[in-house]
Regions:
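Short beta-strand scaffold segments in enzyme catalytic cores
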Residues: 87-91
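A common structural microfeature
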Residues: 48-49, 84-86, 100
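Conserved phosphate-binding/catalytic loop of the ribokinase/pfkB sugar-kinase fold
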Residues: 92-113
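A glycine-rich helix N-cap at a beta->alpha junction
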Residues: 65-84
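Short glycine-rich, polar/acidic loop-and-turn segments at beta strand-coil junctions
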Residues: 53-57, 79-82, 93, 107
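Glycine-rich phosphate/adenosyl-contacting loop at the front of the ribokinase-like
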Residues: 1-71, 96, 113
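Short beta-strand segments
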Residues: 6, 81, 102-105
Length: 113
């Protein structure tokens, strides 16, 4: 079985648990996107996966490629773009306060595919 994912992978900036964005003076950095997350899970089961997307042609985009490849995800169909990689901010919930996501993806590489 082979599975391809088509979607945007973004830079995720998240707060520490219990901190609101307004209270934060730093963010934790990771990468995320629904399709990439599914492919990572499938690759753990030995399923061949490939990502179809576009990322910025800079160190962030190249780091995303390295990240995907570290999970044995085929990146043959990932294009490098002069547009930026999308970003999302994750305010990690705590107690009864749920998590909150703010997207910043206007004019991103994926939106310009």
């Amino acid at each position: 079985m082979k599975v391809a994912g088509f979607g945007e992978i973004m830079l995720r900036l998240s707060t520490d648990v219990g901190k609101m964005i307004l209270q934060s003076d730093r963010f934790n950095v990771n990468y995320g996107g629904g399709e990439a997350n599914v492919l990572i899970s499938l690759s753990h089961f030995g399923i061949d996966t490939k990502m179809i997307t576009s990322v910025s042609n800079d160190d962030i985009g190249k780091s995303i490629l390295r990240y995907l490849r570290s999970y044995d995800i085929d990146t043959e169909f990932v294009t490098l773009s002069d547009h930026r990689t999308g970003i999302y901010y994750l305010q990690v919930g705590s107690g009864i306060r749920s998590s909150k996501v703010i997207y910043d993806r206007d004019n991103s590489a994926f939106c310009n595919m």
